[in-house]
């Protein structure tokens, strides 16, 4: 069993660097940034490019996440995403990393973010 306090973690800046470094790669080789906050939180502010998979539906929908891609998990502060990181690692995913400090740290670092209503397809796991 994985302890949520001891899951692999990176800073928001490092997570963004990983995403940017893979920017030109085929979609199936790029890391996916998964936000586990609830929709009302996600619509207010989100890391640019994040896909939404709310914690409230995570147990039912986690199987939608690819097991052959790097996954970066994010939430508001890093607590919920640490729990989901631990869950995925305990259930067969091998390349899952928590974004320490979550969206709060992302914004404090001045990293790309979106605010307000979603564009069509924005936040979809398949986008």
Residue ranges, per PLM feature:
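Rhodanese-like catalytic fold shared by cysteine-dependent sulfurtransferases
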Residues: 1-32, 39-70, 79-127
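Short, surface-exposed ligand- or partner-binding patches at beta-edge/loop junctions that are enriched
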Residues: 74
């Amino acid at each position: 069993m994985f302890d949520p306090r001891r899951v692999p973690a990176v800073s928001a800046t490092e997570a963004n660097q990983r995403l940017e470094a893979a920017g030109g790669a085929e979609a199936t080789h790029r890391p996916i940034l998964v936000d586990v906050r609830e929709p009302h939180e996600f619509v207010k502010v989100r890391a640019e490019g994040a896909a939404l998979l709310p914690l409230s539906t995570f147990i039912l929908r986690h199987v939608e996440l690819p097991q052959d891609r790097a996954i970066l998990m994010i939430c508001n502060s890093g607590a919920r995403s640490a729990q989901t990181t631990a869950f995925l690692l305990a259930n067969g995913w091998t390349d899952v990393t928590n974004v320490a400090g979550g969206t709060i740290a992302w914004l404090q670092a001045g990293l790309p973010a979106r605010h307000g209503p979603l564009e069509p397809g924005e936040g979809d796991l398949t986008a």
